[in-house]
Amino acid sequence: MEKRVFLIVLDSFGIGAEPDAAAFGDEGTNTLGAIAGHPNFNCPNLKKLGLFNIDGVTAGEKTDAPAGAFARLQEQSMGKDTTIGHWEIAGVVSPNPLPTFPNGFPEELIQEFEAKTGHKVLCNLPYSGTEVLKDYGEQAMKENALIVYTSADSVFQVAAHEELVPVPELYRYCEIAREMLKGAYGVGRVIARPFLGSSAETFYRTTNRHDLSLKPPRATMLDLLKEAGRDVIAVGKIFDIFDGQGVTEKIKTTGNTNGIAFTKALQTRDFEGLAFVNL
């Protein structure tokens, strides 16, 4: 068996707010603390590795002899979204945050997007991805419109009903948006959010999500490994987050269970290098 590393990121799984959380409107956030009280919460393997032994973690029970090394890390980059975080893991610290749009995107930008896609745009506000379908999904179906929304992160998200806007067409619209969103409007990710269903109560997001990211501003750990002749296997969103830069093989997943299955399958493969997994 060759030398290899499995680097698995539990995306958005935090253990408490950082000192600068107020700058991002995230005071008091703690994903682990929020879910640990649920009756179905159970993570024996993470417990064995030392999750509950990490400094500052008050949820769960510590283990006397952790099987893994553990630490509490603080991000150095000025930003908190998926793109910035993964880039830092790979060695790129970002001195400036990617732009966010708490009041929606400028009207002239939306009008240009409408003209280039031939579809009316609805919403154009920060929104929950599930709530936006409840509030705008039926109108989008009636008008064959696109739902554009953002969040606290640097994202431009485009939702469309798969039966009205085929998935490849939605991907093309997102490529149009990616070309438009540069400079001051250069969001970290443009995200295609296809959905299905027939009413506000039945709409659901499908597994055909697709992210279009900015390229990292310089070489990352992935590039160095690739240049050294090592394998860099991207599982889940990793390929999209790095816009393919430094990746030698990509594995698309349809969710966390699927992602874990692919990761377990990789454990039986001979390769030398990195398996970078996003769950």
Task: Locate the predicted segments by residue.
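Beta-strand elements within well-structured catalytic alpha/beta cores of enzymes
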Residues: 2-16, 89, 225, 273-279
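Active-site nucleophile/metal-coordination loop of metallo-enzymes that catalyze phosphate/sulfate
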Residues: 12-161, 165-168, 193, 201
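Glycine-rich, charged/polar anion/phosphate-binding loops
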Residues: 71-75, 132-134, 176, 216-219, ...
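A generic local secondary-structure boundary/capping motif
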Residues: 77-79, 135-138, 177-181, 221-223
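Amphipathic alpha-helical segments that form well-ordered structural scaffolds
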Residues: 112, 173-176, 220-227
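Active-site glycine-rich loop that binds ribose-phosphate moieties when present
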Residues: 127-132, 168-176, 213-216
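Anion-binding catalytic surfaces of enzymes that hydrolyze or transfer phosphate/sulfate esters
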Residues: 142-150, 154-155, 181-279
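Charged, low-complexity intrinsically disordered tails and linkers
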Residues: 157-187
